[in-house]
């Protein structure tokens, strides 16, 4: 009974804390479907694979935990434009983040590395090609890495439609930071791809593992067939008149 009560208190405290951060930084009062469960899993130290539709709010699933972690959250992202958009959005709400990629001048690149060493950054975005370089591995070895997040994780799988060989090397980074929790996110993954992601990233090897698959049903998107009435010429004439107005 005591264990149950303590577990409930801790669980309730985590939910309260998450909602406080959600309101403080994003202005929302409640989470979208599955966001809360995925965040709870990550904060509980579970390796996690989450399949969520585009627009389902995947970013919050690692951004919220990053605010609680003592170390940095490294986010592997496939496109420079996505990194820039995310960092700009985070900066606008006061969450310290940056990216390291080929779009930066050398001076800015080295300054960003200095900020990471200082411990002032909560989220680092980089491409898999950048992450596996010796320079970045040496940089991350000087700080605490609390979470490794892989966005567009289907790129890991040779069975996926966007396979990128560099993504498979992320498993090497996992071995360098065994204490870091791993979160893999994607909007598209068959059962075969999910199994390949889990195997490649060694999800659940040293930590508990949880998998979440959200519904892809969009009630606001539908197909409808409307039978036409009247002649085509009449409709075209009406369109011409409306354009003339």
Cite the ranges covered by each PLM segment.
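Conserved pre-motif I regulatory segment
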Residues: 17-51
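Post-DEXD/H (motif II) to motif III coupling segment of the RecA-like Helicase ATP-binding lobe
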Residues: 146, 154-213
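Conserved helix/coil segment N-terminal to the catalytic DExD/H
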Residues: 105-147, 157-161
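Walker A/P-loop
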Residues: 45-63, 76
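Conserved nucleic-acid-binding Ia/Ib motif block in the N-terminal RecA-like helicase ATPase lobe
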Residues: 74, 80-126, 211
């Amino acid at each position: 009974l005591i264990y149950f009560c303590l577990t409930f208190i801790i669980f309730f405290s985590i939910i309260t804390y998450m909602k406080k951060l959600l309101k403080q930084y994003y202005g929302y009062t409640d989470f979208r479907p599955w966001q809360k469960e995925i965040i709870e899993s990550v904060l509980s130290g579970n390796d996690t694979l989450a399949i969520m539709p585009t627009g389902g709010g995947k970013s919050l699933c690692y951004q919220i935990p990053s605010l609680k972690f003592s170390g940095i959250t490294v986010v592997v992202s496939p496109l420079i434009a996505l990194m820039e958009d995310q960092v700009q959005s985070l900066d606008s709400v006061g969450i310290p983040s940056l990216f390291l990629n080929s779009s930066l001048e050398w001076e800015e690149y080295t300054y960003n590395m200095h900020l990471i060493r200082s411990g002032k950054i909560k989220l680092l975005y980089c491409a898999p090609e950048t992450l596996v370089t010796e320079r970045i591995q040496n940089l991350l070895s000087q700080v605490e890495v609390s979470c490794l997040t892989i966005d567009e994780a289907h790129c890991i799988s040779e069975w996926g439609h966007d396979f990128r060989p560099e993504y498979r090397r992320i498993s090497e980074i996992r071995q360098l930071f065994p204490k870091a929790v791993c979160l893999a996110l994607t909007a598209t993954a068959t059962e075969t791809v999910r199994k390949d992601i889990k195997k490649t990233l060694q999800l659940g090897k040293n930590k508990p593992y949880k998998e979440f698959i959200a519904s892809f049903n969009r009630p606001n998107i539908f197909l409808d067939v409307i039978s036409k009435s009247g002649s085509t010429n009449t409709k075209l004439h009406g369109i011409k008149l409306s354009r003339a107005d």
